[in-house]
């Protein structure tokens, strides 16, 4: 899966999420859990991939300098170790938004102090205002809202996330106007893109729509 964070002059690639240790079985898990399902907001994708990936060292080796590498912590000390491993000039997205990371969501402020072009924190749609306060107070000024909506059978993407993302945008822009917000969830056309931009988002991320790549160009131009 690739995710695209779109900007005025083009698109920046955000990789799939890498963890400290490899978690094999990605293709098998995609075939097993990826489904197109009906929801109250319309048909959408549901997945339960479980952060399957080849590990952080493969991520570092295969992430181009102009892309953003997504990373996640699964154990209490992982953020500290990841900070020591990841090059200090590499753009990163700290993914605290998957159900797998709920046990150890604690961020270190270490990443925030470096001069990276992008040091993004990706948050879940169900994040609280208090948790957002803490992230900003740690020094993080780029927040990506938001990841899939958790259910018993996996995370839901698409339009069902939009109300949550709009709420996060509203809170951040009212309380922390300096924070750059990357908004995503259900962006399938210019109307849904502009809905987030009009709410105050600085950038837009595209996820599920990348399954229909012919639609992407009309959104980012």
Describe the residue ranges of each PLM region.
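Active-site mouth loops of central-metabolism enzymes
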Residues: 1-2, 48, 68-79, 120-128, ...
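N-terminal capping/small domains of soluble enzymes
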Residues: 1-67, 72-74
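Catalytic cores of alpha/beta
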Residues: 2-6, 79-86, 126-138, 172-176, ...
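Hydrophobic faces of well-ordered beta-strands that scaffold small-molecule active sites
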Residues: 11-16, 67-71, 92-94, 119-123, ...
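Glycine-rich phosphate-binding active-site loops on the catalytic face of alpha/beta enzymes
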Residues: 15-21, 94-98, 142-152, 187, ...
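Glycine-rich tight-turn/loop motif centered on a GG-T
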Residues: 31-50, 100-113, 152-163
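Alpha-helix-loop-beta-strand connector modules within alpha/beta enzyme cores
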Residues: 53-66, 106-125, 156-183, 219-221
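Glycine/Thr-rich beta-alpha phosphate-binding loop at enzyme active sites
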Residues: 96-106, 130-179, 213-219
